[in-house]
């Protein structure tokens, strides 16, 4: 199986999605920083998950129309800005708005990542490619909590967002070098399979 730029970008995006579990470790610190009740912290998760779930399928369909590569690049840019916003939020309300933007951009990224995987390899290699993609996502899920714990030992809760800003820079460079920003790149000939769209819900 030939490893292409779009495939690498998709796998890096999968790893990124798993790393968001680092946020859970920061809940006590976020609660204290914004002086909110413990019951309110659930909105940190709800604001992200609800936005992500609602927009995931439309993002995949939009990728079918204008190219999954361009949608991926847009998602990467907005996600990076969302991490900066989360890190600099001065109030809980602004922080939740940042989480909404993070959920929306993650929908753009993961709504197109499975399509990038399948479109970048031959049909014969698609099962293996999707398996590698799933493994990178699982690696992110496994690493998120330990990474979050290490960051909180050294810095404030904002670090669980700030450390991903450089990651997004690397991901954006990789996407641009792969030509994903060009019109029509990685455009599906057929609508994205429902299973692939739901793989990250």
Task: Give residue spans per PLM region.
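Conserved small/polar residues in nucleotide/adenosyl-binding loops
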Residues: 199-201
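Flexible cytoplasmic inter-helical loops of multi-pass small-molecule transporters
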Residues: 181-194
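Transmembrane alpha-helical segments of multi-pass membrane proteins
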Residues: 43, 196-197
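Transmembrane-helix bundle of Major Facilitator Superfamily
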Residues: 1-181
